[in-house]
Amino acid sequence: MQRVTITLDDDLLETLDNLSQRRGYNNRSEAIRDILRGALAQEATQEHGTQGFAVLSYVYEHEKRDLASRIVSTQHHHHDLSVATLHVHINHDDCLEIAVLKGDMGDVQHFADDVIAQRGVRHGHLQCLPKED
């Protein structure tokens, strides 16, 4: 492990210290390592051709005009990406769906964009992880 020195302005250091405390890090180095790993992983998933895993989560109104069938159609069109799906009934009108995906990150992003762009889908979020060799 290498020791490096960085310079941060006071406001940024205070923000880092607050984040470290909220997340329970023992020291700044642990927090900075995790932040850096996250940024590097996100960057790696932006490269077309990169293989990886992702979690797509979203809320949708199950009775919205044909929305459920459009989402299922999109899922079947990208069936090669889907590893597993969890479906939760939040209330009478809304469902939470969580899909674990695996494959080319460009294809995963395209699938996520197709789902999230559907009218009636809310709170869409894609978390990508590059495949580690």
From Swiss-Prot:
Its cofactor is Ni(2+). InterPro entries: Acetolactate_synth/TF_NikR_C, ACT-like_dom_sf, Arc_rbn_hlx_hlx, CopG, CopG/NikR_regulator, Ni_resp_reg_NikR, Nickel_NikR_proteobac, Ribbon_hlx_hlx. Belongs to the transcriptional regulatory CopG/NikR family. Pfam families: NikR_C, RHH_1. Homotetramer. GO terms for biological process: response to nickel cation. It comes from Salmonella paratyphi A (strain AKU_12601). The keyword Membrane does not apply. Binds 1 nickel ion per subunit. One of its GO terms (molecular function) is nickel cation binding. Transcriptional repressor of the nikABCDE operon. Is active in the presence of excessive concentrations of intracellular nickel. This is Nickel-responsive regulator. Ni(2+) binds at H76, H87, H89, C95. It comes from the Bacteria. Signal peptide: none annotated. Keywords: DNA-binding, Metal-binding, Nickel, Repressor, Transcription, Transcription regulation.
